[in-house]
Amino acid sequence: MADIFDEIDEDLKRDQIQMLWARYGKIVIAVVAAIVLLVALRQGYTAWQTSQSEASARAYQQALKSDDVVAALEAGRGQLTDGYAMLAQFQIAAEQAAADDFTAAEASYLALASDASLDPLYQQAASLLSVMVAPQDAEVAALAARLSDLETAAGPWQAMALETGAGLALRAGNTDAAVAKYKRLMDMADVPAGMRKRAERMIVMLGD
């Protein structure tokens, strides 16, 4: 009889974990995307100030008002200066993810991540986002490999990489690895309160 209750408890715990990730997954993506866009906007605005590329700013803003933002940004990319061109690529990837075209979104972020002309900060953000929007049938080990450097190197993306990596570990059925990542996240300073609370909750739910 005890075995039956243990199985029920495990099923409930698994359902709770799935519900938490369903609830927070989109929020995580939105938060990271917002950070990337804000930083990129700052770079784009600085470029506009120094080069007086007002036409680039107008072209970008006009594309955002289009019924087909992706097509408009793709068509107008040649008019954009470096800062706005990068921002456009991030926007294209975000639009693709919003349209549930996760394969295209992942490819767009990977293109940014491999662009050596970009500041490493943006390359790292793109690499993280490529994992977060990857299709459900993507190979977990390959996704985890993209996060390995971000999880260990101090920087603005480390906490988010650890949280994302913990989710991948859960998908792979490796509860111990997931708990270890959540604990590392909890030990970090300056972790957003919401993220810390999620990590704490997951540690409790995973029974550690």
Residue ranges of predicted features:
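N-terminal positive-inside, membrane-proximal cytosolic segments immediately preceding the first
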Residues: M1-A34
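Alpha-helical membrane and juxtamembrane elements of multi-pass inner-membrane transport
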Residues: A2, D11, D15-Q18, A57, ...
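A charge-rich, low-complexity, intrinsically flexible signal that marks solvent-exposed coils, linkers
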Residues: I8, T50, E54, V70-A72
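Short, charge-rich, low-complexity alpha-helical interaction segments
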Residues: V28-A30, S51, R58, V133, ...
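Repeat-mediated protein-protein interaction surfaces in helical alpha-solenoids
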Residues: V36-Y45, S66-R77, A105-L112, A141-L150
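Transmembrane signal-anchor/signal-peptide helices with a preference for the extracytoplasmic
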Residues: L38-R58
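Short extracytoplasmic
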Residues: R58-Q91
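Soluble extracytoplasmic domains of inner/organellar membrane proteins
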Residues: Q89, A94-D208
